Amino acid sequence: MKEIFDGERLQAIERMMQYYRVPGLVFAVFRGDGEPEMHCLGEKNAEAKTGMEPSTRFCMASISKSFTAAVVSKLCDEGKLDLDRPVTDFVPELRYREKQMTLKDMMSHRSGLANHDALWPGDKSRAEVARQMRYLDSNLAFRSKYQYNNTQFVMAGYAAEAVTGRTFEKLLEEYFLGPLGMTETSATEAGIKACGNMAEPYRVFGTTRHRLPFWNMDLAVPAAGVNSSLNDMVKWVRFHMAGGVTKEGERLLSEKAFREMHTPHIGIDAEPVIAGDPLVLEGYGLGWRMGTYRGTPFQMHSGKIEGYSSTQIYLPEKDTGFVIMMNLHDPELVLFHGIMYDALDEAAFGIRSSWLSRFSAEMGLIGEHAGYEAYRELFADYTTPEYKGTDQKQTSGEAHEKEHADLSGTYQNPGYGELMVYKEAGTWMLHYRDQDLPLLPVSGNRFVMDGVKEDTWILRVPVEFAAGGEGGYEVLVKYDESLPPVRF
């Protein structure tokens, strides 16, 4: 395959990386079993100035879902699970309010269950989360609409553990990582620490890039915790391009199981990313999105989590694949789609395009700080008008203190578990999951909590203390905009 990304194109990518404060980026385009064209730009550690390599690992975030779907599909081949029977037939403790919930519903995002991303990560076990699922609310009718849900993939991984007595991580290694020779891939924080070649995660706040601590994703590995390298992700995508067969000719997934993974089970309504967008997203299978690119079918998935972004895509009829990763949380649309479209156009269709330039002009490089709109989209405010309209200065300090009895204590919710309220240096603090955050006074028993991490979002949420039984309090926290506050 003729080299697609020459010096001029690579320089354009590097200019955009500099503009968006991207520390490092790696990508590969490949056809069939030919030598992939790989490029490693920038740095895995911006402070130490250490360069990217094809073996450098990234958190793959939601691309992990394609691995989980493969593990569950393998267990279906072995008769230990079934996509179309209620999951309680196999894992009785994994109960939902919707009693007909199947693994296919869970892994195609059609369950109707609200996101509930506040549940993870943390020090809970997957078994504990499984016992909490029966208490969680839906916000859509069952099987009515596509709604992305990380928690359901965590539970699909737990189902695999429950029927085998082995950890999801060991199943992944035995069924796929080992046979595919993916020696630069793991699914634990310990694996990240041991590899010695992990890209450091970064995120932009305002207009300044900050290095982040690694976010322990061990609980949520089946949804977002697999880490891998460019070398290994090329192997993973090629395995799917070959229909579930290794390069040595060994079939790891039956044709039926592979077909179920890559067949849409729910439609997706998606707007074009840019005018004249050649990529049309149509549906979701099991851990893979699908649609057409220039009228040709594709399979893809993207991932985004604390400090990392990634995309995998392949066109089966063109025997062409593409993988890209960077150690920055957003803005993947401008960079990723521009590079990806240029790569696919030339590799699969023989068209020399300039999508990167178009994305730059239409979505990015306009005005001194225009590109930073991409970062502002990572923040959401769930506070309602009665919170937003209050002058917090009027209720701060001694006057506000007199309004409250002792709010400290441990509060429980059967679906969300335990949170703790305590006072530190005169400020009320709320501990939940892996975060300790200050409660900013609003009025009466109302507070606002900033900096709540849920999946890819940083949230501002309202917190209210309401009178409870025996003269105590209940804590109401609005962790999900589509649901009433969670009552602890």
Question: Which residue ranges define each predicted feature?
Answer:
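Active-site-proximal loop and beta-strand segments within enzyme catalytic domains
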Residues: 3-4, 18-19, 23, 31, ...
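A short secondary-structure junction motif
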Residues: 36, 110-114, 136, 179, ...
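Short, mixed-charge aromatic SLiMs
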Residues: 92-100, 176-186, 262-266
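Catalytic loop of the DD-peptidase/beta-lactamase superfamily, centered on the K-T-G motif
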Residues: 1-40, 166, 170-174, 178, ...
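An acidic site on a long C-lobe helix of protein kinase domains
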Residues: 102, 152, 229-232
